[in-house]
Curated annotation (Swiss-Prot):
NCBIfam families: PRK00558.1-5 (NF001824), uvrC (TIGR00194)
InterPro entries, sorted: GIY-YIG_endonuc (IPR000305), GIY-YIG_endonuc_sf (IPR035901), GIY-YIG_UvrC_Cho (IPR047296), Hlx-hairpin-Hlx_DNA-bd_motif (IPR003583), RuvA_2-like (IPR010994), UVR_dom (IPR001943), UVR_dom_sf (IPR036876), UvrABC_protein_C (IPR050066)
GO MF entries: DNA binding; excinuclease ABC activity
Protein name: UvrABC system protein C
Domain UVR: 207-242
Source organism of the structure: Paenarthrobacter aurescens (strain TC1)
Organism superkingdom: Bacteria
All residue ranges annotated as the GIY-YIG domain in the record: 16-95
């Protein structure tokens, strides 16, 4: 741990203007981002009396090795830049609100040519509208009911393509729960209109659709079209059924998001009710570990930044009113920022009495129950992870905490399509965004030890390259993002501050490397690190069958008890690396098995290869075609056709033509 005095900037070097600051660890990784109205006052508070800081702030300043800052023109700019950097760097000492994955969302993929309605969990995707979350039973019942009125596509991409190629819709198309765009019953624009109506209904405009259907039903009755009128009546009943599931909680013209918190010393639970048209249209929850010594107003500020800033298509999701238990810090700037995202005024208020205060109380009760449930579920998990990491550290006699572990595995079939995987575990949990896969060719693919040496060399050579490429950080220097030719220290508008820096893929080294294998693989990995001059990364191997743990240059393995949580953690990491490697190997092997002579034609991509085969019917006919005939295929120009003819001609000339054989007698025929 670093002494804060070793990187403390001189007081006179720190400006007294608003700005955003970053603390970095010895590896250059950003571990905390903060903003301040007065940079000098805020930064001095970290260094004046480190022993008097709260525990987590104390841990942060001792984990850091440098600090830098950016001067901005206003508090609004500092708010925007702080959010941008937290989103880009994901500092481990900042508050991060993590979604409660218990309940699914109803999602509409508006970014696709034919939008699809589906039930989704997990991270949000760009171009997709989300509604909810709901319980699993309620969401499927709602979706099934609404597809009667808004027959939007709900099938997977594979089912859609099969129906498109066969010309026959799936079952939902036959029972009128899908408009069957796959077979051309509706145009893409008509189908998109249905999807937009679906989203509008879920967004709170139910009464408008019901009124429109009632008018259409009355018109059908007037025209004596009773069959159509009966269908419209059933649609109205279906919409009312969905509409009445949501209780009226506020005035019908109220659109608001109601936030409430329940917190203790270590964690905070947040719940929000999305009220549209006076009815609760969805509920969402987060739990945050208070790694930062934040007050409730600061927590609310971070919460609103992350909730409304996480999606670029946020304009339609921000209501006119945001109700919170306490006004956030930087209240006016936050309202201005949200208003800019929405394109209209947004009020952030604390309800004092009436229906809104009563609803806030209900949301707060939900937050309290969610925190109790979260702590019950995580109590055992955190204890077991901590025990496993401690057991490993003690058994392997490693002097540093195992904050990051990387595991490597080699996969192949009889030396073909050799690949390697790298999986990452931080604080005992997998970090899938850092997983990597490697293709291994040449001499390194001859055996497992050579492959292991190759992949470790490549991984840590990348680390050294990324580390060397980082701009040296001078503690206390005023850092401003500048355009080419701009002078250091100049201020830029927020649009320039939002440009993310290029990310280093391998810039953060592990404390421990685990390889799948015994003594040979471990020694190969250790040799690779030694050749690169890396001596602060520990290496072990986990051998199959007996589950022995091998150390470099050791004649005897370390035997961990079968009931050891440390051994169980190693096994899970090894099995995950094995799964990841096998998946990549199968992809590579499958691609190799479907290789075509057309793959080598320069400029001929997959779509044009398919167009050629579809046009001519076989590779034999493509080979026999002239340049002029090839240009008759869709997307094939004269230059590309000439390249195809030249490539196919060269492949025939490259090898001897196989002799013709009489398949009945086995006689070789003369050509």
């Amino acid at each position: 741990m670093a002494d804060p005095a070793s990187y403390r900037p001189q007081t006179g070097e720190i400006p007294t203007t608003p700005g955003v600051y970053r603390f970095r660890d010895p590896h250059g990784r950003v571990i905390y981002v903060g903003k301040a109205k007065n940079l000098r006052s805020r930064l001095n508070s970290y260094f004046a009396n480190p022993a008097g800081l709260l525990p987590k702030t104390h841990a942060m300043v001792h984990a850091a090795s440098s600090v830098e800052w950016t001067v901005v023109g206003s508090e609004l700019e500092s708010l925007q830049l702080e959010y941008t950097w937290i989103k880009e760097f994901k500092p481990r000492f900042n508050v991060v609100f993590r979604d409660d994955k218990t309940y699914p969302y109803l999602a509409v993929t508006m970014g696709e040519k034919y939008p699809r309605v589906q039930v989704m969990r997990g991270e949000r995707r760009k171009g997709t509208r989300y509604f909810g979350p709901y319980t699993a039973g309620a969401i499927r019942e709602t979706m099934d009911t609404l597809l009667r009125v808004f027959p939007v596509r709900s099938c997977s991409a594979g089912v859609f393509k099969r129906a498109e190629s066969s010309g026959r819709p799936c079952l939902l198309g036959y029972i009128d729960k899908c408009s069957a765009p796959c077979v051309g019953r509706v145009t893409p624009d008509e189908h998109r209109g249905l999807a937009e109506d679906f989203c509008s209904f879920m967004g709170g405009e139910a009464k408008r659709f019901i009124s429109r259907l009632e008018k259409d039903m009355a018109a059908a009755v007037a025209e004596l079209d009773y069959e159509r009128a009966a269908g419209l009546r059933d649609d109205i009943i279906a919409l009312r059924k969905v509409f009445e599931r949501n209780a009226v909680v506020l005035a019908e013209d109220t659109d608001a998001d109601v936030f409430a918190l329940h917190e203790d010393e270590l964690e905070a639970s947040v719940q929000v009710f999305h009220v549209r048209g006076g009815r609760v249209r969805g509920q969402r929850g987060w739990v945050v570990e208070k790694v930062e010594d934040a007050t409730t107003p600061e927590l609310i500020e971070h919460l609103l930044q992350q909730v409304y800033g996480e999606d670029s298509e946020v304009q339609g999701r921000i209501p006119r009113e945001v109700l919170v238990p306490e006004n956030p810090s930087n209240h006016a700037e936050l309202m201005e920022w949200l208003g800019g995202l929405r394109g209209a005024r947004v009020d952030i208020r604390v309800p004092q009495r009436g229906d809104k205060a009563a609803l806030m109380s209900t949301v707060r009760e939900n937050a309290e129950q969610a925190l109790k449930l979260h702590k019950t579920r995580r109590a055992g998990d955190i204890t077991v992870r901590s025990l496993a990491l401690q057991e490993l550290q003690e058994a392997l006699e490693i002097p540093v905490p195992l904050l990051r572990i990387e595991c490597f595995d080699i996969s192949h079939v009889q030396g073909t399509n050799v690949v390697a995987s790298m999986v990452v575990v931080e604080d005992g949990l997998p970090k899938k965004s850092d997983y990597r896969k490697f293709s291994i060719t040449g001499a390194a693919a001859t055996d497992d030890t050579a492959a292991m040496h190759d992949v470790l060399t490549r991984r840590f050579r990348h680390y050294l390259t990324d580390k060397a490429a980082q701009v040296p950080i001078v503690s206390g220097e005023i850092v401003n993002p500048t355009r080419a030719g701009a002078k250091s220290g100049t201020e830029l508008p927020p649009s320039d501050l939002d440009v993310p820096a290029p990310k280093a893929k391998f810039a953060y080294p592990p404390n421990l490397v685990v390889v799948d294998g015994g003594q040979p693989q471990v020694n190969a990995a250790a040799r690779a690190l030694a050749e690169l001059g890396i001596d602060d990364v520990y290496v072990v191997g986990l051998a199959k069958r007996l589950e022995e743990v091998w150390l470099p240059d050791s004649d005897f393995p370390v035997i961990l008890p079968r009931t050891s949580q440390g051994l169980y953690l190693l096994q899970r990491i090894r099995d995950e690396a094995h799964r990841f490697a096998i998946t990549f190997h199968r992809q590579k092997r499958g691609k190799a098995m479907t290789v075509s002579v057309l793959d080598g034609v320069p400029g001929l991509g997959e779509a044009k290869r398919k167009a050629l085969v579809a046009h001519f019917g076989s590779l034999k006919k493509i080979k026999a075609a002239s340049v002029e005939e090839l240009t008759s295929a869709k997307g094939i120009g004269p230059a590309l056709a000439a390249a195809v003819v030249q490539h196919l001609g060269s492949t025939e000339d490259a090898g001897e033509r196989a002799p013709a054989v009489n398949m009945t007698t086995g006689e070789i025929l003369e050509s």
